[in-house]
């Protein structure tokens, strides 16, 4: 099995286990195979930031592997934002940070928040 196919299977399984919601922010996600797209079909525009990605809890750059124990499903925005920081926060610390920002309405854009309401 190709590495990318295996990672897609792991991401899809993890997204299903997470109820189609991002590991960090809890927003619903969509993917090419339609997982999580139910309930996001309010119109033709689906925010790219809510695309489901495979998030490595321990980044590959730090030796993280592609196994189920190291991969969760995260929206594109949370995944990219975590890795754009100077120092990548540990997953639980980053999750707390993100959820605090979500509660204060300062995480996803207003358009994305309106889209999922």
Feature names for model-found ranges:
Residues 67, 71-94:
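Short Cys/His-centered divalent metal-binding micro-motifs
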């Amino acid at each position: 099995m190709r590495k990318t196919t295996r990672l897609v299977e792991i991401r899809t399984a993890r997204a299903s286990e997470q109820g189609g919601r991002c590991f960090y922010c809890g927003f619903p996600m969509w993917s090419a195979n339609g997982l999580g797209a139910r309930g996001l079909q309010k119109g033709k525009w689906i925010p790219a930031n809510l695309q489901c990605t495979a998030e490595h809890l321990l980044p590959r750059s730090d030796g993280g592997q592609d196994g189920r124990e190291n991969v969760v499903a995260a929206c594109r925005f949370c995944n990219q934002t975590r890795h754009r920081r100077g120092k990548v926060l540990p997953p639980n610390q980053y999750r707390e940070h993100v959820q605090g920002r979500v509660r204060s309405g300062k995480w996803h854009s207003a358009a994305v928040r309106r889209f999922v309401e």
